[in-house]
């Protein structure tokens, strides 16, 4: 495939709009209607579709769209050893909208051992083909 030189540059941060199927699956999971394995299966399928679309349009760098995350930063922190998810009194306020009241609490030495995002990266890496897999970390 011939690569076209464009008169501009664009970077993909990594986050794509979540498909309705994935949004529904997350709600069902939070309500206890969907198991962790069933949620992961839906995430995997939607990520596979997204990566295929990125390849079709010729992107050289692909991402999972952050489809497994509910926050771009807190999900990463919650995967570290020595960090716990913490409920707080108020969420972040941005343009008069309040987010979920969640944060982090340091409970011990911080480690990255067995961080779940390593498996997430390996999943997109095996689908990348000739493209470069990209994962956003804070």
Model segments located where?
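Domain-level signal for soluble alpha/beta catalytic cores
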Residues: 1-138
């Amino acid at each position: 495939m011939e690569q076209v030189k464009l008169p501009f540059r664009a970077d993909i941060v990594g986050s794509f709009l979540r498909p309705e199927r994935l949004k529904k699956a997350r709600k069902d999971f939070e309500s206890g209607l969907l198991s962790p394995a069933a949620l992961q299966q839906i995430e995997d399928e939607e990520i596979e579709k997204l990566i295929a679309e990125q390849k079709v349009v010729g992107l050289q760098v692909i991402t999972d769209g952050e489809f497994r995350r509910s926050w771009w930063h807190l999900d990463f922190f919650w995967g570290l050893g020595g960090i716990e998810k913490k409920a707080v009194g108020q969420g972040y306020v941005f343009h008069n909208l309040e987010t979920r009241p969640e944060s982090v609490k340091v409970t011990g030495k911080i480690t990255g051992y067995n961080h779940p995002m390593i498996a997430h990266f390996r999943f997109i890496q095996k689908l990348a083909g000739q493209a470069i897999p990209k994962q956003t970390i804070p």
